Amino acid sequence: MENDLEEAKNMKLLLCAFEQLSGLKINFHKSEMFCYGEARELGREYSQIFGCDIGTLPFRYLGIPMHHKKLRNSDGKTVEERFQKKLSGWKGKMLSVGGRLVLINSVLSNLSMFMLSFFEVPRGVLKRLDYYRSRFFWQSDGHKKKYRLTKWEVLCTPKNQGGLGILDLDLQNRCLLSKWVFKLISEDGIWQRLLRNKYLRHKTITQVEHMPGDSHFWSGLMKAKNDLLRMGKFKVGDGSQTRF
C-alpha cells in the first residue's frame, strides 16, 4: 500500500466489507502493520486507522524469525523447543519400535515443515532435530543410553532400499525449495513476476547464480535449482525460452 492516509482508510473499509460479506472476523488487535521510509512518520495515524500496533523487524512467524539475514543455528531453537515439548508428553517406554516410528514420521518430522518450506535450514539445526528423533527412536525415554544398531542415515532411506522411510530433513528441505523453483518457472503470478523482475531480468533460471546481497529465500532457491535441473527435463517449445 502506498504512503497515503486516504488510501489506508479505503483499505480499512474494504477489510470491513470483507468481514460483512464473508462472515469472518479480522482480529486487528493481534495484527501488526509495518511502515517503511517516509511512512514511518505517519505510523501513529496508520495505527489508529487500522486499530493495530506498528511492528518492527525482525518478527517471528510460526516461531521462525522473519528478516533479511541468513538463518543461524540459534534461529532453530523455537522448533527444538516444540520437539522437546512433544517428547516430554510421550511415554516412549510404553511404545513399541513401530509406535515410535509412527510418531516420528507423523508428528516430529512435521513440526519443522514450515521452516523447511521457505528457508535453507543450517546443517546445525537439522543435526539437532535429527538428534531428538534418533534419541526417541533408540532410547525411547531419552534417559537410559542404548546402543544404536545402525546409522541414522540408513533409517532415513526408503523401505524398499532397506531403511525405515524416516523423513530425511535435509533432502526434504531441498525438495520443498525446488518446488518454489518449479512454480517460478511454470506459473505466472504476482510473486513470480516480482522475482523475475528483481533477479532474472529477462534471463532464464539456468543463467542466474547466487549474488551477494540476495535475499535468504532467493539464495535457497539458487541452491535448490541445481537439484531440480539435474532431475528435470526442459521442453523446447518454440525456442523463445531456450538458450543454446
Placement of each model-derived feature along the sequence:
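A helix-boundary/hinge signal
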Residues: M1-F244
